[in-house]
């Protein structure tokens, strides 16, 4: 196994010395320190559970080349659609093969790992004097992605057969896009797996939280201490799941990556600031009215509803962001039609880009029409073509439109045929949009699961708390000798309300992390998570209050319900 690990190091760009000194040695030292601390601080079953941590760290360090190689494979596959579209459209220009590879190797932001693979092809052909076919075969044996390796093998065979690069890449579009579609569908399957993982983890943590509420009646542990430990464990597990899912999901963002904020970005920030200001004003006022001055009707409101009401203004910024996100999706839906129409019009008029845009700007392309008119005005004023198209992509707020409109403009700039370029880009773009529809449906199911799970957590935790309060009231009403109290650990607990606040705090943590996770999985705008946070928090608050009300009636616990 050691030999296999060292054989993989060159493929992930590591020397054996760097691997041992930068990864294995720090992991080994950390594991030893953790093991020593474990033997000093813990014993029994807790020690065995704790020792899993240094073992995981050490195994991860040893298996780092496998992890890095798998990560490279995913990063290559997730950009295949961009690579084949850019490669195909640029191949119909006047660029020679070396210049084409050089351009691809410089697109680090757009192509990621595929830019590095293109750089290897460029170095092999330019510096080492290899033919493109030989370079493709050499790289196909070393790339971690089987899909990309198959593409390189097909390219090498076509070039050896005397086929033109342009003709091959135009025919290859459907094949590579089918490979990308298969990869995307596997990603959707992994989303289902992550949903199951999240539900299982949250169910287990809910059981642990419920157990931590009742265990002080059975074992000599402090009530508040157990609840606090459970809260931190809850937070740590949720955060770990988010990190794992974020690192495993392929890159598929919706929003643009422009450095300067667009009008839409400024609008969203304005509404976010308004929402935050309202929360800063409303939440302290509600708490002051209830707990300090006892102002009616706030003093009679349950604190769960009060907190949810205080955070509700955040939904304003989230709702505005959701509307803009839906508008971006509609823009992506009509973009292929616009580009195909533009390509046909420019080709028919013999290269009149400005006149074609003037004609198309009078047609209805939904929410994209405004951006098309701005593009026409920029080009009519003589602004640089590439810059105008780049600004068009940013104004659309769509990452896909940003990328593919830039590909189209560069193809035209280098002398490519507008009609052919538009056909390649629009066809591939349409396939990506169709794949995304499946993902959005999958995410909607996950949103329903998260909302329902929030209610389930609130029900389980506050039901357990109601039982704990009943037992506590029972012990308080009994005259038990002090000797028996110390033997059986049945002393009444005086800080039950603190534990209740800690439990509700765990539901707030769940609402925050779940809302963030939803946007990580769908790749949308992060501000929309505010709307999900408020919705989940309201569900948790309402279910918690109703559960507390029902438990108090069923078990006869005389506790204040507000």
From Swiss-Prot:
Membrane protein topology class: Multi-pass membrane protein
Coarse class of the protein's main subcellular location: membrane
UniProt KW Lipoprotein keyword: no
Keyword Cell membrane assigned: yes
UniProt cross-references to InterPro entries, sorted A to Z: ArlJ-like, T2SS_GspF_dom
Recorded GO CC terms: archaeal-type flagellum; plasma membrane
Stated family: To M.voltae FlaJ.
TM spans (from-to): 32-52, 53-73, 199-219, 225-245, 273-293, 302-322, 446-466, 498-518, 527-547
Domain of life: Archaea
Annotated keywords: Archaeal flagellum, Cell membrane, Membrane, Transmembrane, Transmembrane helix
Localization (cell): Cell membrane; Archaeal flagellum
Protein name stated in the entry: Flagella accessory protein J
